């Protein structure tokens, strides 16, 4: 969703990042008069965010938590409190509330992929809240997104666990593999891109030992060198990263 604004607001974006907007912005069109959506005036933003914060922290037992998250996200995007980055922050807010309200123990599910895949419908659903007051349709769309993202997260977790288990099996079966290579392999999910010096520090060992451990993993095609250089070489657990970024 492109945010159009006057030239002074465009100039202010870089210098006012993280600050509440002090000028009027709008979405689509060349001016507020022909815009697709015009957020509240800047002098209302602080009070509207305060209301939203009170809603987040107030007990609402009559509303399921996922429904509350749907309402919070839509309201945040409607307030549009910043000149830039509102979409990213709004999506992060979903993940933060899922974890903070105990629906996820870890941030393992993100709706960003679903919302990007259904971008036009996402914008349409937000629009009909504002034009028709149709919150039910938005909540239904949001919950469908949660179900889809949860299923995709489950598939990704299974794929990642299968990859790690298979690579571990191959490493344990390798006759020349030693303790340092085993330990380094178990660290890969926490540092899927690294240099030999990083491995040395993580293993708390000598450079030759760390280098041999990396070489073992490279020979098994678990990691691969990605720079093509003879010095300052970087290694990547590429298959793992690919699954994470799918």
Regions found by a protein language model. Give the residues of each.
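FIC/Doc superfamily catalytic core
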Residues: 1-246
